[in-house]
């Protein structure tokens, strides 16, 4: 659960940083008018929506055909969804004002590949706890959304001059590091195994059965001692 929380927080940071700051980056660094800015800011998300269909289908097919385990599929998709955007953002940090085409291509690449997380950690809640996937999503999403507040605020602190490529580079590098560490945590500690707390009723039954078994054993020993005492008394008499 903790690995899921960390990677979801990392994704939320990157998602909201890009969503809220792409228009400012494109408009200020490349001096794009508001009409073209709107088009170029929306294009990465349109591409992401289109890419979500084949990614979901391929992930599902690979699991059904036993090419990948559920856990392997989750981690591979999550890696695509967080490490590829991290690499794209590092590249974006070195794009100059004279290279708007490269910047737009990298932004599209970063945002489009990010949708793979919907076959990664975003469905991991159902893997961990089919019975409590909703509450689990509520808990992790609540904590992760703190990052959705912090990301734009910290971006505003780092990028004080929106037309300064160097300041944007620092912000992109920070986001790349967060993406990298978030997914690394999920790769190392993440799991798709159903957790014990998923079925509290069964757990109570197991405890009750264990207690009942222990009581039966104790009664058996007590009865055996009584029988032994009776036999000893019989011999003495």
Where are the language model's segments positioned?
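Paired intracellular helix-loop junctions of major facilitator superfamily
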Residues: 31, 64-65, 97, 124-134, ...
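Interfacial helix-cap and linker-helix signal at transmembrane-aqueous boundaries
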Residues: 26-30, 58-59, 63, 154-164
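C-terminal transmembrane helical hairpin of 12-TM major facilitator-type secondary transporters
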Residues: 71-120
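A membrane-interface helix-boundary motif in multi-pass transporters
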Residues: 33-35, 39, 70-76, 157-178
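Transmembrane alpha-helical cores of Major Facilitator Superfamily
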Residues: 9, 42-46, 83, 108, ...
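Intracellular terminal tails of multi-pass secondary transporters
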Residues: 163-237
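A late C-terminal transmembrane helix in Major Facilitator Superfamily
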Residues: 52-53, 130-162
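Extracytoplasmic gate region of multi-pass secondary transporters
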Residues: 1-56, 114-126, 148-152
């Amino acid at each position: 659960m903790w690995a899921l929380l960390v990677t979801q927080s990392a994704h939320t940071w990157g998602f909201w940083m890009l969503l809220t700051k792409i228009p400012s980056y494109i408009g200020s660094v490349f001096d794009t008018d508001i009409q073209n800015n709107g088009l170029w800011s929306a294009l990465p998300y349109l591409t992401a929506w289109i890419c979500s269909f084949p990614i979901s289908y391929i992930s599902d097919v690979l699991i059904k055909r036993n090419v990948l385990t559920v856990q392997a599929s989750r981690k591979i998709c999550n890696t695509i969804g967080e490490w590829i955007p991290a690499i794209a953002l590092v590249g974006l940090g070195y794009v100059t004002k004279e290279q708007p085409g490269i910047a737009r291509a990298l932004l599209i690449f970063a945002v489009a590949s990010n949708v793979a997380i919907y076959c990664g950690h975003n469905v991991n809640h159902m893997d961990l706890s089919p019975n409590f996937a909703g509450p689990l999503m509520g808990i992790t999403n609540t904590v992760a959304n703190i990052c959705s507040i912090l990301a734009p605020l910290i971006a505003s602190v780092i990028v004080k001059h929106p037309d300064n490529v160097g300041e944007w580079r620092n912000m992109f590098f920070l986001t790349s590091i967060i993406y990298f560490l978030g997914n690394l945590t999920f790769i190392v500690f993440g799991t798709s195994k159903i957790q014990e707390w998923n079925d509290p009723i069964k757990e109570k039954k197991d405890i009750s059965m264990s207690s009942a078994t222990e009581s039966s054993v104790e009664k058996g020993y007590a009865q055996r001692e009584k029988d032994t005492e009776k036999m000893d008394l019989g011999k003495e008499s």
